[in-house]
Amino acid sequence: MQLNGSQIFVEVLCEQGVDTLFGYPGGAVLNLYDELYKNADRITHVLTAHEQGAAHAADGYARATGRTGVVLATSGPGATNLVTGIATAYMDSVPMVAFTGNVPTSSIGKDGFQEAYIEGITVPITKHNFTVRRVEDLADTMRAAFRIAQSGRKGPVLVDIPKDVTAAVCEFTPKQPEPIRTVTTYNEEQVHWAADLINAAQRPLVYFGGGVRSAASCQPLRDLLHKAEIPATHTLMAAGVVPYGDPMNIGMVGMHGCYTSNRAVADCDVLIAVGTRYSDRVALKPKTFAKNATIIQIDIDASELGKNVDVDLSIVGDAAYVLNAMLPQIKPAKHPDWMTMIQSWQAQDYHPVSDPTRLMPHQVIGEVCNQCGPDAVYVTDVGQHQMWAAQYLRHTKSRGFITSGGLGTMGFGYGAAIGAQMALGRQQRVVMFTGDASFHMNLNEACTAVSYELPIITVIFNNSVLGMVRQWQTSFYGKRYSQTDPHRKTDFVKLADGFGLKGYRCTNLPEFQQAFAEALQRKGPTWIECIIDKDEKVLPMIPGGGDINDIIME
């Protein structure tokens, strides 16, 4: 059948199972938006306040579901406003397809109105990108973009579509989506060797990251831990893969991980790293990381093997397939001496002391868990509040904690929460933690939450400073607070009212308990501002370039 480019665009989106699209219209994509208008019963378009918010929303949608998030923006500044969101998804291996409009093909390279070379700009932050110069290529290019985003190590793909391509006509043939290409192969000899090392270990430790969540390999990982009594530590991106309360889960590792996890890495004799890249927030001193251990690394991306830390055995493969192949070769085991040692370290973990005269982050987060129960989805911005949430939330769901890990994008949270809420439905409880500085970045997305009546509860830790940077200045820069005390006078309660939502301000725990209970009953979005001390710190902390011997506990 004969269709124009805009009709093909919608047909392929539907063919790929896209039900929700985040974006912002403009001149170069008006043809696409006209077709979306005609197909509003097939695809829900979510209009955000800013293209960056749309990109983060597509990201949040993908993280909450595992499906590909889709974002659409116009040419020039519309496209460049997506860049931070695309880079955020790239660093955390999130499947996303970003569509951008462009000037007509005859005008490309002539510095026309709202022209930007978005294909070149995004080369370092996408798995692949395309510029479609013929309408005949549009359908297959879109299909390739979705396939690439979900295949192997997941990530974002950009498709740039000049305006004349959206109006041109060609023959279109519908196709069924191709199965996602999964890496099912692995080296059986290496898997056997890994099993032998694990079976012989006296102090084994599993260290897992977000790649386990992406590989849908949570259950075989848990089976391994319990079959051989192996304690496990995780990165920020893997919170919830092994639930809170599981005796094998000893907590987060790294710069703001717990004492036990960091001590266990230093003292284990076999370290099994699964779906993690040894980032500099975990392997702070790469040359001595797990220095007493034989290190096994399992990853779907061969380029990550041994990239940051020298390993003894590298296995390329999807974690689910590798772990399932390894499990029958693992002997049931107990490690009583090792577990006793772990328990002795747990007695030394940092536990904040509550102060009844003020509101403290761990109290707030604990109360949120008490009132929400185990099924909530938590989203964060970036800063101290992100680390407090990682440390004190009772993570029970593999996709229940959404945060920007690799890029550390301040302003990520509200857009991501909108995407998660749209993906999971209004009946799903979504709570977003932010700080006053991070929230200032993209709080304009409040209008989106209001427009779509999304019951997102936003908890704002307000210490009136740039908390994480200021903490570093306190510890390492002689308390020289350069540009971290902004002296802002933002009234978040009045601002909430201006956006058309309910806002609260709390200075003690009873006030927060009441405000949060009321927020749970509301149908639309709510902000709860929590006034905390500007000297509140994220502890423990291992300085960059340090190790367990440098840990700061007070």
Question: Which residues fall in each region the model found?
Answer:
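Phosphate/pyrophosphate-binding active-site segments
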Residues: 136, 174, 292-384, 509-514, ...
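Thiamine diphosphate
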Residues: 99, 107-109, 113-114, 306-308, ...
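Charged, low-complexity, helix-prone segments enriched in Lys/Glu/Asp/Gln
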Residues: 61, 80, 337-354, 420, ...
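N-terminal alpha/beta PP-like core and its mobile active-site loop of ThDP/TPP-dependent enzymes
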Residues: 1-331, 367, 371-374, 429, ...
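Well-ordered beta-strand positions enriched in small/hydrophobic/aromatic, beta-favoring residues
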Residues: 69-71, 159, 378, 401, ...
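Active-site diphosphate/adenylate-binding microenvironment
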Residues: 9-10, 14-19, 27, 32-37, ...
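Active-site nucleophile and cofactor-binding loops and adjacent substrate-binding regions
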Residues: 24-26, 45-56, 71-78, 133-134, ...
